[in-house]
Curated annotation (Swiss-Prot):
The keyword Nucleotide-binding does not apply. The modification Phosphoserine is found at residue 175. Residues 1-36, 91-176 are cytoplasmic. It comes from Mus musculus. This is Transmembrane protein 238. The gene is Tmem238.
Length: 176
């Protein structure tokens, strides 16, 4: 979420960065660090509730058409969209120490990581091989995947689609 960083400010540098450990951030006072996200959430809540309550209690008619439902639905939509602001504000105020980040997300050898590296190397090996070797591997895979014809007399049919022209359809002839 690169768009969230200007709203909430930078909280910490990357875990693998070689910078000296930064001092612990000061506790957030009052509204927290993400004041713009909080302002967005509160503004959307106020506008949504105003539209929703106006749609419920006011009799809005223009040229005999009732617009109460429009205000109810748009107010509910604004209140729902305010959840984005609340989520940004809440997640922007979570404080995690560098030690906790390194403990939870540090590079530790695990069986899953080894398996992922092994599969990645195996799948990327044909891509780095020469084109002739890669073509040979592809044809070998196709031969293994191709269904074997059964002895019941079935045969393989090749279907080719071609565009039909208006003149050839009317005349009953077509190029095949």
């Amino acid at each position: 979420m690169a768009a969230a960083s200007p709203v909430c400010g930078s909280q910490a540098s990357a875990v693998g960065a070689s910078s000296p450990p930064a001092p612990a951030p000061a506790p957030a006072a009052g509204l927290g660090r993400c004041r713009m996200a909080l302002l967005l959430a509160v503004a959307l809540d106020v506008a949504g509730m105003a539209a929703l309550l106006t749609g419920v209690f006011a009799q809005l008619q223009v040229r005999g058409r009732d617009f109460g439902d429009l205000l109810i639905y748009s107010g509910a939509l604004l209140v729902f969209l305010s959840l984005l602001g609340w989520i940004l504000w809440y997640t922007g105020n979570i404080e995690i120490s560098r030690q906790e980040l390194e403990r939870d997300y540090g590079l530790r050898p695990s069986a899953i990581a080894r398996l992922a590296r092994k599969l990645s190397r195996r799948w990327s090996a044909p891509a780095t091989a020469s084109p002739r070797t890669t073509a040979g591997l592809r044809s070998a895979r196709r031969a293994n995947r191709a269904p074997q014809p059964s002895s019941s007399g079935s045969r393989r049919v090749r279907l080719q689609l071609a565009t039909l022209e208006a003149g050839s359809v009317a005349a009953g002839t077509g190029s095949e």
